Amino acid sequence: MIQLFRRIGAFNNLNTLYKEKVNLLKKLRETDLPILHTLIYSSEKPRWTLYNAPYFDEYKQLNLETFLQSENRLFFLSENVLAIVHEERIIGVVTRYWEDIRTRWLEIGIVIYDDSLWSHGIGTSALQEWIGICFKAFPEIERVGLTTWSGNPGMMRLSEKLGMTQEARIRKVRYYKGTYYDSIKYGILRDEFFALK
């Protein structure tokens, strides 16, 4: 997560660029961080870590004080992250970062920390909203991408439900617990996305 924060770069202010009604997503505030901390670090090995790039082995359980003093705090409060809200409570986040800002290559991600809410259509709605926000915030970009791995079939299905195209499958480059998995890249172009709406 910290590596992701370092790659982000500057983004324009979300609130001034996106004026449409937001249904599922909201900007995180300082007062939301203890709630988010509980969601993320509720156990030594939460279920979401099994699917969110576990081959990087980056998850470390942090106490609240350490979390609030870490770079993760800045990451979650940045314009590159919005909270996913369901029934008035935070359940996850959507993120974005520049793979290469010079070539206008933007990538997005999503984590729903509460696994009891997986496969309820919430992720689909949240990412659809987020893609729209990204295209509106950056009128110069023509594509939004998402990278996952073959060990996360739920994310693959979600990407396809959103109308994203599988643009690349880099075979056997994610070695995890004795098994090789593929890295899978999805993308959707601006005109494709707005044609679906």
What are these regions (language model features)?
Residues 1-39, 81, 85-197:
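Acyl-donor (CoA/ACP) binding surface of acyl/acetyltransferases
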Residues 13, 68-73:
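Short, P/G- and charge-enriched loop/turn segments at secondary-structure junctions
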Residues 29, 57-60, 77:
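Generic structural signal for well-ordered secondary structure
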Residues 36-44, 64, 68, 127:
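Hydrophobic alpha-helical core bundles mediating ligand binding, dimerization, or RNAP-core interactions
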Residues 45-69:
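Conserved GNAT-fold acetyl-CoA-binding loop/helix
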Residues 72-77, 164:
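Short loop/turn motifs at secondary-structure junctions and domain boundaries
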